[in-house]
């Protein structure tokens, strides 16, 4: 318990330093997520790469005033779809999304949090309830996969084993376009 508290505190401080260290972090809020980004161009690129596939028809232009609204809508839509695919509906679901400007930035954050190297372009850090995405490698399946990790963490009182988490996240990614 003490180790978990130390790790959570350390991760939170790292995240704050990361976000603050990159100048003026901007944020938008959706129903479920607080979305953090450093520059408008990152949000625009994230939005362009965050293609909804067959769900694109749901983007009614009269309901969307700009890129921020579109990102909010897409985020909430995919969270709802993932919850439905997994048949898991956690109460008071809230999480953070950090939009990083490159895969290198993702890898630096991962190393700061976990003290390990990786080649991930996205990951979910349950200790700080944050999904990290690179604007350079956004696919709907990746978004669904990471959101599935977040939904499961919020749903279960005791998180399932890593292999079960991964299996269900892959299931959500595979079925996001059904």
Please tell me what each predicted stretch does.
Residues 159-178:
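Post-HExxH zinc-binding segment in Zn-dependent metallohydrolases
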Residues 23-25:
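Boundary at the C-terminal end of the N-terminal hydrophobic targeting segment
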Residues 126-144, 156-160:
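Short pre-active-site segment immediately N-terminal to the catalytic Zn-binding motif
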Residues 141-154, 166, 170:
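Active-site recognition of the HExxH zinc-binding catalytic motif
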Residues 11-20:
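Bacterial N-terminal signal peptides
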Residues 65-127, 137:
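Auxiliary, metal-adjacent structural segments of Zn-dependent hydrolase domains
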Residues 29-67, 151:
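Acidic/histidine-rich, surface-exposed loop or edge segments in extracytoplasmic proteins
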């Amino acid at each position: 318990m003490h180790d978990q508290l130390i790790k959570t505190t350390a991760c939170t401080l790292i995240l704050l330093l990361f976000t603050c260290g990159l100048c003026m972090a901007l944020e938008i809020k959706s129903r479920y997520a607080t979305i953090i980004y450093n520059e408008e161009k990152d949000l625009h690129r994230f939005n362009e790469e965050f293609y909804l596939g067959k769900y694109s028809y749901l983007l009614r232009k009269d309901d969307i005033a700009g890129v921020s609204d579109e990102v909010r809508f897409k985020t909430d839509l995919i969270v709802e779809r993932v919850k439905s695919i997994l048949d898991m509906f956690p109460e008071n679901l809230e999480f953070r999304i950090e939009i990083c400007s490159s895969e290198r930035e993702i890898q630096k954050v991962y190393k700061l949090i976990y003290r390990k190297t990786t080649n991930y372009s996205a990951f979910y850090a349950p200790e700080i309830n944050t999904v990290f995405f690179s604007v350079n490698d956004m696919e709907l399946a990746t978004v669904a996969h990471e959101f599935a990790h977040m939904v499961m963490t919020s749903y279960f009182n005791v998180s399932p084993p890593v292999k079960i988490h991964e299996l269900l996240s892959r299931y959500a990614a595979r079925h996001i376009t059904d």
